[in-house]
Amino acid sequence: MRSLLSLIPYFRKYKKKLLLGFVFILFSIGANSLYPLVIGAAIDDLTKGTQRYSLITYALTGIGLIIFSGTFLFLIRQNIIVVSREIENDLRHDFFSHLQYLSRSFYNTRSTGDIMAHATNDISNVRNFVGPGIMYSFQTFTRTVMTLFILFSLSPSVTLLALVPLPFMSYIVYKVGKLTFNRSRKVYEIFSDLTSKSQEIFSGIRVVKSYVREDHETNVFDKISFDYQKKNLNLAKVQSFSFPMMFLLTSLSIIIVIYYGGNKVMEGSLTIGNVSSFVIYLGQLTWPMIAFGWIINLVQRAAPSMQRLLNITNIKSDIADNEFTDSGIKESDIKGDIEFRNVSFKYPMSNNFVLKNINLKIRKGTTLGIIGQTGSGKSTLINLIPRIWDATEGSIFIDGYDIKKIPLNVLRNSVGIVPQESFLFSDTIEKNISYSAGTSSDINRDEVIANSKIAGLYKDVNNFPEKFDTVLGERGITLSGGQKQRTSIARAIYKKPEILILDDSLSAVDTNTEEEILQELKKIMNNRTSIIIAHRISTIKNANNIIVLSNSVIKEEGTHNELVSLGGIYCDIYKKQLLEEEIKDF
């Protein structure tokens, strides 16, 4: 319950609409509460032999009350339910926005399906509480107070007897609600698994097809889906029990009214019209009794859902601007001079250091080549520069500033990374390349074309029917591996970063294309600090400085010629690759 108090700021934002909705509830229920009295008066007049014009008056009055009540019921929903949708939108925006700023460590411990379930199911549960829950709570309270006041004014004794079954109705709904909550939680957990599995299969559909595992994955999915169906059926069994019980208890109340009310009519203390009004009022009280238990159920579902959302939104990113950030540092202050001082790093939940005591200087405008076996820490090293991760020990400086003091947006805007795995969005090629542009109106087509030429992509794009307006599939699935890498390169250089990092981003292209791209990149790399990670020495041999990472440390450092002369790890790799080339040529 306490978690729902966090919704108060959202309610304050829409307090005028909510208050107006509550006022409309009073008008609607007030008119609705008079309707049974009109029916009762009409029946009494009929027993006395009323005139035709009197019946018309009662009919018109009844119709007028229904129209009046219905109009305000419409206005209620236009205010309170609309507010619930607006709050739902605000919650979804805040949740999604918060997710964008969480650090990498958060995503390493959460599945995409689980996050998606929070963004759909949990927010939907909260919305049901904010809209129907609050609306029906006030309606139930108002209707109960007004109806009981009128019933007690007609006959306190009959009212008390008629109300005896109704609390049982609320109790049943409450108990059913409790069972519903427990089973709903199980449904939610399976739904999260179902979403995760779906997302995983569709993301890896190429692997599934290449290994001919379609039937296997379908069977695995069917098992989860069947479990989801079973849990939903268990939930439906509990919910279906409540409706027959509601009908039984409502019928019991009506029978009590007819029996005891009939005796009162014979005694002369009540009229037939009064008894008729009683029956209608009991019908009106039935919904509040049901709603009471249903509202408790909504609260029971919304409270844990809100808590799950809060568990995420209360997480503070471990990499963010803080009181030590120097807001005076601007992008114009970043020139690209980088220094690692005694930097060591290990991933969260791990005891093993991926990098140990790294000391490295990269001068502004120079190119650093990095080579080493798989798992030596190459990608980890470059991910420390834009603070995707923070160094466990030691410090990194850019132009004399500790990177922890540089505002994150300044730091990351100054760094352009082409990652190992090229991720492209389901959008046009132009928008993928110009991703760093603020809005569509900020996109410069000439720059998009120029950067695509540098990345060796322009000829390929021109062969597409829609050219740069070609819409890519999910993750750029319509492009080849090499085309995706080149699109990522074009995207990085479109940003015009002071520091350009290529993380093995030419591995999917042939050596001739690689050479062409590198020659084009030289034109823009002259004035930029560049870091190139590669497995092929041909990619980095012209770098100003090259380091060899092995077992988490820098084993060798120097130019291509110096490292070949050294006769160490670099030289061995170079000789093996030369031999491979000779074998290919042979």
Would you name each region that the model predicts?
Residues 99, 221, 309, 340-342:
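Conserved catalytic Walker-motif region of ABC-type ATPase nucleotide-binding domains
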Residues 12, 23, 31, 35, ...:
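Hydrophobic alpha-helical transmembrane segments of ABC transporter permease domains
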Residues 48-54, 150-167, 173, 234, ...:
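Helix-loop-helix
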Residues 327-586:
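ABC-type nucleotide-binding domain
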Residues 18-72, 79, 153-157, 268-272:
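Transmembrane helix-loop-helix hairpins at lipid-water interfaces of multipass membrane proteins
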Residues 104-105, 121-130, 134, 138, ...:
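An intracellular "coupling" helix at the cytosolic face of ABC transporter transmembrane type-1 domains
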Residues 2-3, 11, 43, 76, ...:
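Juxtamembrane loop-to-helix connectors within ABC transporter transmembrane domains
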